[in-house]
Amino acid sequence: MAFEKEFHRNLRLTLREKREHLKGAITIWMFEDGRLVGETYGTPLDGKDEIPDGCPKDSHSIYCDSTTILRKYKNKGYGKILKAAFIGRVSQDFRRIYGHARPGASQALNHGFGARLGKTYKNWYGTGEDYRIYDLIIHNR
């Protein structure tokens, strides 16, 4: 649950919630010298799970719930590596990635991979931050 500490309290999942959510997710954990550095996971937008705000029900799309690097390892390029790994993995089965990104590094990271930033969601889940939806078309076919 180390990653939950990186989130605003309103966005944190309990261990039970996270276990249940990850059952239907594609998940990648990143390690450096055996130490956990980052995690990313996404859930298909096929309607089996709740569809996040602004996303379509589309079996060819996936929602990237999180790409998180632990604070100690931030600003070392790990986020870009992990996001690239996620895109590579999901490109086998999906044509588009959706997500909601925080202002700053998260939006820049996704935009850097070619994501189109869309609607702003003010005060996302009471965090005090304005998140933007993004979508990234995967050119794999």
Specify the residue positions occupied by each region the protein language model found.
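Active-site rim helix/loop that mediates acceptor-substrate recognition in acyltransferases
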Residues: 5-33, 47
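Glycine-rich acetyl-CoA-binding "A-motif" of GNAT/NAT acetyltransferases
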Residues: 34-38
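Conserved acyl-donor/pantetheine-binding loop and adjacent beta-alpha core of acyl/acetyltransferases
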Residues: 39-66, 74, 124-128
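Residue-level recognition of the GNAT/N-acetyltransferase active site
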Residues: 65, 70, 102
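Conserved acetyl-CoA-binding loop-helix of GNAT-fold acetyltransferases
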Residues: 69, 75-88
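Conserved beta-strand-loop-alpha-helix junction that forms the acyl-donor binding cleft
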Residues: 97-111, 123-126
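C-terminal "cap" of GNAT-fold acetyltransferases
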Residues: 123-141
